[in-house]
């Protein structure tokens, strides 16, 4: 069972008080993940600690639960009951903003020279939230308040293609994880981990990437 050192916890005041009374060691075991939420450019998880009641649940950033992979995977399974839990990506499969260019494998070098090729926008997929909605220069706290909607009521839906109105942007959090900022058809603004977005609304993600690609013809001399 993964354990987390006391000094790594972002909210540990209540746990420390309980620890003083019971003489527990300076490590806590993750029993399960209850829910998640967007926090700026990152995802936080509401964690239930083994041996502690719900009153001691704390919100922890992704890096604080990195050692609790099984608990996090089990949580994502509850968010998508029809799919298996996301498997751990290998080094070669690590997904970064710089790898989001869509480049078809050419059938031959001559054919490739005649085809258009794609490249991401100057700033890549990481872009500011749509300036048309008044977010130019918005702080992380401002974005938190805007994109604070809950995904709980959508968790039982197999597909979110019909409930996601639009993907506004995809940004890379401090831990390296890509996060989708979306507006639902009900008007609420939410943050979605990319692995969940790729399962629930893959076409919406594809349309977003296509919209932010720039096409340019290849020089015949290249």
Swiss-Prot record:
UniProt-annotated location(s): Nucleus
BP term (GO), one: chromatin remodeling
InterPro entries: Chromo-like_dom_sf (IPR016197), Chromo/chromo_shadow_dom (IPR000953), Chromo_dom_subgr (IPR017984), Chromo_domain (IPR023780), Chromo_shadow_dom (IPR008251), Chromodomain_CS (IPR023779), Heterochromatin_chromo-domain (IPR051219)
Main subcellular location of this protein, as a coarse class: nucleus
CDD domains in alphabetical order: CD_CSD
Keywords for this protein: Nucleus
Keyword Nucleus tagged: yes
Basic and acidic residues composition bias: residue spans: 1-15
SUPFAM superfamilies: Chromo domain-like
Keyword Nucleus: yes
Pfam families per the UniProt record, alphabetical: Chromo, Chromo_shadow
Region (Disordered): 1-26, 77-147
Biased composition (Acidic residues): 16-26
Gene Ontology CC terms: heterochromatin; nucleus
Outcome of gene disruption: Mildly decreases methylation of the fifth carbon of cytosine (5mC) in DNA.
Chromo domain residues: 28-87
Subunit structure: Interacts with DMT5.
Function: Recognizes and binds histone H3 tails methylated at 'Lys-9', leading to epigenetic repression. Localizes DMT5 to heterochromatin characterized by trimethylation of histone H3 tails at 'Lys-9'.
Protein name: Chromatin-associated protein SWI6
Organism for this UniProt entry: Cryptococcus neoformans var. grubii serotype A (strain H99 / ATCC 208821 / CBS 10515 / FGSC 9487) (Filobasidiella neoformans var. grubii)
Lineage: Eukaryota, Fungi, Dikarya, Basidiomycota, Agaricomycotina
